[in-house]
Amino acid sequence: MRVVVQRTREASVTVAGEVVGQIDHGLMLLVGITHEDTEKEVEFVADKIANLRIFEDEEGKMNFSVLDKGGQILSVSQFTLYGDCRKGRRPNFMAAARPEQAEPLYELFNTKLREKGLQVETGRFGAMMDVRLLNDGPVTLIVES
């Protein structure tokens, strides 16, 4: 499992001209699932992200998590995170899980975040989406299982 985590002041995702998910202060997550991922990886990554201390305290030190700050999550599935660009000029996506495997794990990931008390908005799995965000910092990290 691979998740790009971006600290954001605001973010939204649009499908066919309709806003399907929108948050204010919090984290924008681009979520990739690979063949080997199971519930164990999902739980590990959800816990890691919920408790990752990437929000600053009064002294500018990253000391608070999205939970501590009462932030929100915008979670967007993105199989292209498993694109392999080492050979040729076209990415190979063979490492990305097939939709029938990835979608239940993506939904479980969002459920695990909600169970921790986070407000989670999502994109639409498998859809072409327009994602907009105002990156705060910028702070961008990659979390992997």
From Swiss-Prot:
GO terms for biological process: D-amino acid catabolic process. Keywords: Cytoplasm, Hydrolase, RNA-binding, tRNA-binding. Pfam families: Tyr_Deacylase. The keyword Repeat does not apply. InterPro entries: Daa-tRNA_deacyls_DTD, DTD-like_sf. It catalyses: glycyl-tRNA(Ala) + H2O = tRNA(Ala) + glycine + H(+); a D-aminoacyl-tRNA + H2O = a tRNA + a D-alpha-amino acid + H(+). It is an enzyme of class 3 (hydrolase). The keyword Plastid does not apply. SUPFAM superfamilies: DTD-like. GO terms for molecular function: D-tyrosyl-tRNA(Tyr) deacylase activity; Gly-tRNA(Ala) deacylase activity; Ser(Gly)-tRNA(Ala) hydrolase activity; tRNA binding. Its main location: cytoplasm. An aminoacyl-tRNA editing enzyme that deacylates mischarged D-aminoacyl-tRNAs. Also deacylates mischarged glycyl-tRNA(Ala), protecting cells against glycine mischarging by AlaRS. Acts via tRNA-based rather than protein-based catalysis; rejects L-amino acids rather than detecting D-amino acids in the active site. By recycling D-aminoacyl-tRNA to D-amino acids and free tRNA molecules, this enzyme counteracts the toxicity associated with the formation of D-aminoacyl-tRNA entities in vivo and helps enforce protein L-homochirality. Homodimer. HAMAP family: Deacylase_Dtd. Belongs to the DTD family. This is D-aminoacyl-tRNA deacylase. The lineage of its organism: Bacteria, Bacillati, Bacillota, Bacilli, Bacillales.
